[in-house]
A protein has these predicted regions:
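Short alpha-helix capping/helix-loop boundary micro-motifs
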Residues: 43-49, 197-200, 238
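The conserved catalytic core of RNA pseudouridine synthases
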Residues: 101-132, 165-220, 247-282
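RNA pseudouridine synthases
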Residues: 1-169, 183, 274-280
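Pseudouridine synthases involved in rRNA/tRNA modification
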Residues: 1-33, 206, 214-282
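Conserved hydrophobic positions within beta-strands
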Residues: 76, 148, 188-191, 224
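A short, acidic/glycine-rich surface segment
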Residues: 69-71, 129-131, 170-175, 231-239
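Short, surface-exposed secondary-structure edge patches
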Residues: 48-52, 202, 244
Length: 282
């Protein structure tokens, strides 16, 4: 029977890249086949070439059964009338997760494609606005687990720097000093374990900047193992290190929620990082 999807573009990008990012389990090669076969309509018009779409464009796609799209396994950690909490696997775009659910979901915060762990979606636009404000006011506390190399000298610390996002390159610039157009970012860390010259960290972002933990730890001189965008070229990772970043959102806690979401106060959701550290123990 196949599957019909109605999607909305949030930025300018080519159709194939958009589909591969938004449709769970759909590779770029299979997305290209859909385009060539005329299975994609942009704003109601059939497209057979890999054109650029713009923010706000309506994208309708039909995926026939023969393409055999393999959906990623996504664990639902919590589900009620207002929110759903997923444990996102690696290499799955956060904004593709709503396609796996049987009702509309609204994004509240981001989780990078190669970062695993907990992410919250709202079930109504009202809840989306309330949760977005709660995240902004730090009423939702996030804890990340990361493996960095080399290990920081101090066992704990709070780092402060300034960052500016280059939207066209999806790249966060970092400066030690305040500059025009830069925003403050604050990241707290605590060493959980030192092993093989590396360290397992608990990381608490006190601000919510794009790529904050990845960019900030690298700027601090302790890049995340397997992280390539902000990794330091002069630092060679340990032998056997994985090629994907060792960063996971492992804990979400709610406090100070108001109105119809006050019942979330005191709730905490947790997951494991699933890091394989054997390469550090050799």
């Amino acid at each position: 029977m196949g599957k019909k999807l109605e999607l909305k573009a949030e930025k300018s990008e080519r159709i194939v890249a958009f589909l591969a990012r938004k449709v769970p389990g759909l590779s770029g090669a299979k997305a290209n086949i859909l385009v060539r076969n005329g299975e994609v309509r942009i704003n109601g018009k059939r497209k057979k070439t890999n054109e650029v779409i713009d923010a706000g464009d309506s994208v309708n796609v039909f995926i026939p059964d023969e393409l055999q799209v393999e959906l990623p396994k996504v664990k639902t950690v919590y589900d009620d009338e207002n929110i759903v909490v997923f444990d996102k696997p690696k290499r799955t775009a956060y904004d593709a997760l709503p396609q796996l659910y049987d009702a509309p979901l609204y994004s509240v915060h981001r989780l990078d494609t190669n970062t695993t762990g907990l992410i919250v979606f709202a079930k109504t636009e009202y809840v989306q606005r309330a949760l977005a404000e709660a995240f902004k006011q730090r009423r939702v506390q996030k804890l990340y687990r990361a493996v960095v190399y080399p290990a920081p000298e101090k066992s704990e610390g709070t780092l402060t720097a300034y960052t500016k996002l280059l939207s066209d390159k999806n790249l966060a610039l970092v400066s030690p000093d305040s500059r025009d157009g830069y925003k403050t970012m604050v990241t707290e860390y605590k060493v959980v374990e030192r092993i093989g010259g590396a360290a397992v960290l608990d990381v608490y972002p006190h601000t919510g900047r794009t790529h904050q933990i990845r960019a900030h730890m690298s700027f601090f001189g302790c890049p995340i193992i397997g992280e390539h965008k902000y990794g330091i070229k002069d630092i060679t990772p340990p032998d056997g290190a994985p090629d994907s970043q060792m960063l996971a959102a492992v804990k979400l806690s709610f406090s100070g929620m108001k109105g119809g979401l006050a019942y979330l106060n005191g709730m905490t959701f947790e997951t494991t990082d699933n890091f394989d550290l054997d390469f550090l123990r050799k």
